[in-house]
Amino acid sequence: MPDTATVQIPAAGTYQLDPQASSISFATRHMFGLAGVHGTFRLISGQITITDPVTSSTASAVIDAASFQSGGGARDKDVKSANFLHAGEHPQITFTSTQLVRDGDRWLLRGQITVRGNSAPADLVITEARTDEDGLFIKATTRIDRYAHQLTKKKGMAGRYLDMEITARATRS
């Protein structure tokens, strides 16, 4: 992650996230930290509202819990099962911002992530934000503690933390 983010404050307005042009990826460890796991989730929908002042801006996103993919068929099935995400009963993972703050040289989008009905705070570090003729482009990173969401099965075998990278494209509505 760069030491300084490239952040261009977009024009005030409401922007709809484009699921087809956005991506959510993660990296974690398993097998007692010996091996890495990389994968993705699929964005269903989301909205960003830029205000003046920008610190009052808001964002929300809905992620498809059943879209978890890591390239390991048995692992993917297990993560989607009642052992972890229980995607059949809790099909959505949601993020709702609570505030946008300047933290030194970077911007943090503070909010709540809800997984399997359990909410926990999360800070999304905005590493890039820019506008172009197609709308708004944002990159952000965050670290999710699965234990904070009561996803505590298979300690040691499945990593506790997921390092997430969100790349989002949004169009002004």
Task: Set out the residue ranges of the language-model regions.
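Low-complexity, acidic/polar, glycine-enriched regions of mature
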Residues: M1-S173
